[in-house]
């Protein structure tokens, strides 16, 4: 596979480099501090609260006001017409899951500029879908790809290069080049996980070829670091900050954010005779942050079933798929 061309058209380069603020009187010393804090674009400054910016060492209230004013000149906070939003939505693209049936219920695949969450019990295909997307994201657009690189945050130690090789072979992609286009970080606690997400903002700003960010899984480390009801409030606050950052990244750099999530028993569902007695971890904070939510469960034999639980533009629907040596695929 050849190297990807730098994203230099309107579809991909939708952000302004933070160094453009020098034209509005912001010094390079302050810009370096912003980059170290993970704010690498003018849009990033615009999305950041004054409270967050004041936490950066050496930033006074007057300096933050000047910074916000400069960013506002470049990114005015105006209302847009529905027609303008419709035009902006044309920048959104989808990445194939490897299954046409699954792509169908998702409206084409995993969308950019939003968070897609898949949840389910073990052996349903969450990690296998993550590996499949690592390869399909690199495919040409006419094959359901996004022609770009992938960032993968592994919180459970389940990333396997051998799976990338097998999936690349299925799609006719050079395995070595496919692996070169994937960067992986292994997080061991929730603070490190947030650190990596912040660092990716800098990486995406410097290299406009990234199209997909995967976190597998989003809640695993939070469940370890925060245990018991006494720490639940703090956990949800930290989770909310992380998800807000992921949403900012997805819109700032027009990338697809794909997160896997674990499930927990739901005793209330059993009492109500509900068909599914499992619910995703993370509560309402997780539910509100994810634009698209997909439930994966075991079906008959080797089949798996995906149910679209929540989507802003697609109705609830189900489909079957299988896990093959070449990744997620349709039932034959």
Curated annotation (Swiss-Prot):
What SUPFAM superfamilies is this protein classified in?
P-loop containing nucleoside triphosphate hydrolases, Rad51 N-terminal domain-like
- Homology family: Belongs to the RecA family. DMC1 subfamily.
Provide the transmembrane region boundaries. Answer: none
Q: Where does the protein end up?
A: Nucleus
Output this protein's name: Meiotic recombination protein dmc1
Q: Quaternary form?
A: Double stacked ring-shaped homooctamer. Interacts with rdh54.
What GO terms describe the biological role, i.e. biological process, of this protein?
A: chromosome organization involved in meiotic cell cycle; DNA recombinase assembly; DNA strand invasion; meiotic gene conversion; meiotic joint molecule formation; meiotic strand invasion involved in reciprocal meiotic recombination; mitotic recombination; protein homooligomerization
| Organism whose genome encodes this protein | Schizosaccharomyces pombe (strain 972 / ATCC 24843)
Q: Which gene encodes it?
A: dmc1
Q: What is its main location?
A: nucleus
User: Which residues make up the binding site for dsDNA?
Assistant: 223, 229, 235
Gene3D superfamilies recorded: 5' to 3' exonuclease, C-terminal subdomain (1.10.150.20), P-loop containing nucleotide triphosphate hydrolases (3.40.50.300)
Q: Name one GO cellular component term.
A: condensed nuclear chromosome
Under the heading Pfam families, the entry gives: Rad51
């Amino acid at each position: 596979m050849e190297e990807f061309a730098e994203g230099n058209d309107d579809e991909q380069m939708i952000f302004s480099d933070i160094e453009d603020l020098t034209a509005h009187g912001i010094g390079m010393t302050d810009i370096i501090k912003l980059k170290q804090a993970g704010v690498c674009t003018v849009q990033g400054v615009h999305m950041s609260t004054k409270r967050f910016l004041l936490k950066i060492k050496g930033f006074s209230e007057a300096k933050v006001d000047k910074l916000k004013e400069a960013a506002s000149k470049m990114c005015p906070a105006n209302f847009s017409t529905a027609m303008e939003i419709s035009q902006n939505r044309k920048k959104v693209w989808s990445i194939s899951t490897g299954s046409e049936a699954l792509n169908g219920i998702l409206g084409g695949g995993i969308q950019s500029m939003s968070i897609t969450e898949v949840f389910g019990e073990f052996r349903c295909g969450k990690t296998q879908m993550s590996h499949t997307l690592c390869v399909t994201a690199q495919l040409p657009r006419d094959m359901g790809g996004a022609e770009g690189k992938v960032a993968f945050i592994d919180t459970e130690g389940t990333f396997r290069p051998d799976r990338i090789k097998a999936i690349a072979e299925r799609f006719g992609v050079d395995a070595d080049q496919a692996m070169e286009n994937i960067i992986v970080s292994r997080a061991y606690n929730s603070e490190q996980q947030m650190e990596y997400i912040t660092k990716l903002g800098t990486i995406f700003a410097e290299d406009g070829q990234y199209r997909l960010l995967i976190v597998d899984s989003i809640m695993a480390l939070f469940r370890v670091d925060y245990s018991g009801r006494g720490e639940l409030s703090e956990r949800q606050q930290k989770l909310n900050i992380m998800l807000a950052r992921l949403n900012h990244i997805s819109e700032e750099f027009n990338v697809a954010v794909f997160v896997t999530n674990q499930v927990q028993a739901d005793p209330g569902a059993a009492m109500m005779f509900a068909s599914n007695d499992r619910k995703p971890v993370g509560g309402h904070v997780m539910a509100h942050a994810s634009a698209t939510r997909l439930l994966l469960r075991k079906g008959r034999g080797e089949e798996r079933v995906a149910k679209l639980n929540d989507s802003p533009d697609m109705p609830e629907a189900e489909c079957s798929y299988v896990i093959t040596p070449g990744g997620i695929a349709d039932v034959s």
